[in-house]
A protein has these predicted regions:
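A catalytic-pocket lid/entrance helix-loop region that shapes and gates access to the active site
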Residues: 71-105
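Helix-loop "lid/cap" segments that line or gate small-molecule binding pockets
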Residues: 103-115, 122-128, 141-148
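Active-site loop/oxyanion-hole signature of alpha/beta-hydrolase fold enzymes
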Residues: 3-48
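Conserved serine/cysteine hydrolase catalytic core
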Residues: 114, 132-177
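Generic structural signal for small/hydrophobic residues in well-ordered secondary structure
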Residues: 2, 6-9, 31, 46-50, ...
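Conserved hydrolase catalytic core segment
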Residues: 38-83
Length: 177
């Protein structure tokens, strides 16, 4: 059995329309509710990718006994103590100013492959107009990039737990995805 949840604000389900409804803590709470309360998963293999790593790695840290293995692709768990790449900081700033927020075009610019019109339409489908893009638009700003970030202490605590995690953990990064 594989569970591949869309993060709140990204999939086709109902979603809050105000950016203030989206916080790192709320995203983590929504995901933990799905995994542990609704699906009642007890022991599972975890694959996290991109934004999902910000949340999934916290789940590993907080519930290590539930995790059998971890695969983490193109992600991390920043604390705001290390300098983020200038390109990410520029994207973080730009994402908050973009209006409209062209989800499909953003995905296309972030890939090395040409995406077909059908694939771009699939990326755009959950966001028929700007009111549906609050979650996608705010997510870059939720990434801790400064020591003052509200999630800095929580991510540092998660790192302390992750350093003790002794189960299989595979990290994947690509320069061509």
């Amino acid at each position: 059995r594989v569970i591949a949840p869309d993060l709140m604000g990204f999939g086709r389900s109902d979603k809050p329309t105000e950016q203030s409804d989206y916080t790192y803590a709320k995203h983590l709470a929504w995901l933990k509710e799905l995994v542990f309360e609704r699906l009642k998963l007890e022991k599972f293999h975890l694959f996290v990718q991109d934004w999902g790593g910000l949340l999934g790695l916290r789940i590993v840290a907080e519930h290590p006994d539930s995790i059998l293995t971890v695969t983490a692709g193109n992600t991390g768990l920043p604390t705001g103590d290390q300098q983020m790449p200038d390109a990410f900081l520029a994207w973080q700033k730009m994402s908050q100013k973009m209006n409209p927020f062209p989800v499909g075009s953003i995905i296309q610019r972030a890939t090395v492959s040409h995406l077909s019109p059908e694939i771009l339409a699939a990326y755009n489908a959950p966001h028929p107009d700007e009111t549906y893009k609050a979650g996608a638009k705010i997510f870059p700003a939720l990434v801790p990039t400064t020591p003052e970030d509200p999630e800095n202490a929580n991510n540092k605590a998660a790192w302390a737990s992750l350093m003790k995690f002794e189960k299989p953990f595979l990290t994947l990064f690509s320069d061509s995805d």
